[in-house]
Structure formats: structure tokens, C-alpha cells
């Protein structure tokens, strides 16, 4: 069985690497995007992405817009992983269709556990 593909979208390369390292330890296949436009390109090119981990504040296209676009024609699970921990932001995320909302700073082990739970 092929490892599930997870697209990690964050404009900070250190954050992408941290998340990628923890996910790869659990045998997930991780793709990375540094902004929303790149994320959309990868999402439409790779037809079998199992889950997205998405930052909100990014250049070119923010996480809210990526979520709106993806939800137009996909129910792929989305985890928002963002420094925007305000209640309004979290509620907006759920309104737009995210499956989980995690505020930074976060526990990488808890993030991986949530990914595994969503994909179970």
C-alpha cells in the first residue's frame, strides 16, 4: 500500500521541514508548497493528496483563499496550522470547511496524531 500523500503549505521553510520530518517518521509521503498558488498547482497536479496542512498568512494566495478554492470541488481533509489563534479566525476556518484548526505554537506529535485520526 502506498503511503498517503500530505501537502504541507507554509511560507516558512523551517516550519515545513519540522512538520515534514515528523510526518515522514510515520511513513507519510510529504509534498511542500511555500505559498497558496504553489499549493493549488500541486493539488491539481497530484490527484491523490490525502490531506492538506495549511497556514493562513502566506504571500500570493492566503490559506483562506486556498481553502475556498479547494472546497469548490473537493472534500479532502484540511488542517489549518496557523499563528492566528483568535476565536474569529478559528470559526472562519470551520465555516470555510476545515476539518481541524491548530494554533501555533503546537506539538508536532499532537499534529501527527490528529493527521492519523482524520485519515483513519
Language model features with spans:
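Receiver (REC) domain active-site loop signature in two-component systems and cognate sites
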Residues: 58
